[in-house]
Structure formats: C-alpha cells, structure tokens
A protein has these predicted regions:
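Membrane-interface helix termini and inter-helical loops of multi-pass transporters
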Residues: 1-3, 90-100, 185-197
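Residues within membrane-spanning alpha-helices of integral membrane proteins
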Residues: 9, 52, 105-109, 113, ...
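Membrane helix-loop-helix hairpins that form the core translocation module of multi-pass transporters
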Residues: 45-118
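Hydrophobic alpha-helical transmembrane segments in multi-pass integral membrane proteins
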Residues: 92-93, 98, 102, 141-147, ...
Length: 242
C-alpha cells in the first residue's frame, strides 16, 4: 500500500491496539482482526510473521497470569489432536481442492455461531465421537490455511463454561501451537530488520490493549462473554465465506 511511512505505522498500531483488546478479553480473535489490515499495509508474509509473534506474546502472558485455570490433561489432549491434524493438513494442502473445503468450513462455523446466538446454548460438552473430529478438523484447517482457530473455539466453548477457564486454556493452546508457525517463519528468513521494527512499534499499543482487555474481562458477566465469543465466531465464519 503506497502510503507515507508514518501513516502506515499509525494504522498498524491501531490494528494491533483494537485487535488485542479483544485478544486479551477472550483469548482469541486477535489474529483474525489484525491480519487483514496488516496484509494490506506490509504484505502477507510480513503480516503473518509479526502478528503471529504479537499474538504469541499476549497468549503467553494470559497463560502465565491465569495458570490456575488451566486444565493440563485437557490441554494436552487438545494439543495432541491439533498437532496430528496440522500434520495431515500440511500434507492435504497439495492434494485437496481448497475451493471446496473453505466454504464448507465457513458454513460450519456460521451455523454453530448462529445456533448458540439465537437458541439457548447446550450445557453439555461435546461427546467424544464429535470432539475428536472437531479437534482433528481444527488442526487440519490450521495446517492448510493457518486459520483453524474458529473450529477450535467451537470445541473449547463446549468444554469450558467458565470465562476464566476458557480464556486461559485457549491462550495456552495458541502459546504452544504458534511456536510451530514462529519456527517456520524463522526458517523462511522473515525475522529481518522490518520485522523487528514493526514488533517494536507494536509493543506500546499492545501493552495498553492487554491492560484494557483484562479490565473489560473482569467487568462482563458469563452470558455477555458467551455472546461475544459466538459473535466473534460468526464474524470469523463470515470472513471465510467472503
């Protein structure tokens, strides 16, 4: 995008600020909200590299700060199935027509979000025969398109009914899995001077955003948190379909 440098920096800082208020509040959606404008400003490779590290910083902070809410057994199971799915997704990327898979994925996310926004959400956790395919599917989508978070949230919203537990565990999942993407970006040589400049200017709005997100998290009740979660899922699914 042919804008003056200071305007591009300002827009980038605004994207980091707004998206990470939501990231700190819910434990997810920061990447979904910040990647599109950052791609327009700096291109897809640099955008994904710097936003992934910024997201990792927030998630690592939330994981440590809220470690008493982490279900280690559940977290281990999630990461195991996600990693298996990611490996399959990386393989399938070259043999499956993404034009068929992406709309189906988007419709699934929109359907789940609308069901829980318009109807009374189920209080039961997903049965094992549904939970495992959902986690594997989230890993496959993430391995293929680096956007499996929405399907993962479908599982986590069912498994963790408390807003503190949900946020702590979803942040913990991304703290671990984003290390894989960070290593890949490092191997591509994306951690260059431009990367560290963007990371540096992103820290100031990031710190303020995390502070505000935590404040809002403590102020809202569980029902409002649930509606926000499914509202973000609806937005994610809609963006996939566009």
């Amino acid at each position: 995008m042919g804008l003056p440098v200071f305007i591009k920096m300002g827009l980038f800082m605004a994207a980091v600020f707004i998206s990470n208020i939501v990231q700190a509040l819910t434990g997810f959606a920061g990447v979904m909200l910040s990647i599109p404008p950052t791609i327009l400003l700096y291109g897809p490779d640099m955008a994904k590299a710097v936003i992934n590290v910024i997201c990792w910083l927030v998630c690592a902070y939330l994981m440590v700060k809220n470690r008493e809410y982490i279900n280690k057994k559940e977290l281990g199971r999630i990461i195991l199935f996600m990693l298996i799915g990611m490996a399959a997704g990386i393989y399938l990327y070259n043999i499956v027509d993404a034009r068929i898979l992406v709309p189906v994925y988007g419709l699934l996310i929109v359907g789940v979000a609308l069901k829980n926004l318009l109807l009374k959400p189920s209080v039961a956790s997903l049965p094992v025969w549904v939970a495992i395919p959902v986690l594997l599917g989230a890993g496959i989508i993430h391995g293929m398109f680096a956007s499996g978070g929405a399907l993962l949230v479908v599982y986590l919203a069912s498994a963790f009914r408390d807003k503190n537990s949900f946020r702590a565990n979803v942040a913990s999942v991304w703290t671990v899995l984003n290390l894989v993407l960070m290593f890949t970006d490092y191997e591509k040589g994306l951690y260059n001077t431009e990367f560290f400049e963007l990371l540096g200017i992103g820290v100031i709005p990031l710190v303020i955003a995390v502070y505000l997100g935590n404040k809002i998290h403590s102020m809202i009740n569980q029902q409002m948190f649930n509606r926000l979660t499914y509202g973000l899922l609806l937005a994610a699914g809609s963006m996939i379909l566009v």
